[in-house]
Amino acid sequence: VLLSVTLWEFGVCMIYKDIEEGDYNRSWTGGGVFAAEFHGQDLNDEQAQFYTNFFKNHVFNYLNAEITQKVLPPYYYMVYDYHALYSFGTMQLKSEMSFYTDNLDFWVTCLEGDVNPLTFAQLVRPKTSEDYLMCRGVILKEIFEKAIEVGNIVVPEEFNTGIDYQTEITYKVGYENDDNYYVKRGFPGIMYTTFNFSDLQSVTKINPQTNFLQYINLGMRYTKEEYEALRPSSKYPLVH
């Protein structure tokens, strides 16, 4: 079932029900000692409307066809209680997943789910502005990363002015005043699976494309005032 939110300009079909279990598991991970398979539930009408509004206002509202061409998959599943189930012999462990983007045919977003009976963890739909920021951020950063990879977003030549990608950096607490401290060198840090920055621990883990992506993430994650308070421009001019 295709949602009315689907815009053909983005080339993706948003699907929220009649998803078969096999659809989640076209690619299996694991094997040997343990294996993992993916599960999720269809949305009801109220949930579908909430997800639809979320994608319209917090994802597609920040995109255009030039960015998403060759980036988004044909299908995007919006589901409830998406999780990986790991099997260890006769034992099974559930791991909640808010998104999945490692398949060429489909991606998945899950905004809420059941309580994990073992860990009591639970995905809860966003309510505050900070919640929405984090939810849309993890999706948009994946889209922008892939857009850079396929060439839809090109790093401007002038972006690398003053940034040294060869000399090793420092990152540990207590070295913030060192000239080679990564933020002083023009590296805001690096985002992995969450929408928060981690320390950049080696210059070998960064290149112009990856660093440019981090600046895109930086612009989404913080306001100018928030980042000034966190990383004063008087101390870290290269990241401003």
Task: Label every PLM stretch briefly.
Residues V1-A65, P232-H240:
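Acidic/polar, low-complexity intrinsically disordered N-terminal segments immediately downstream
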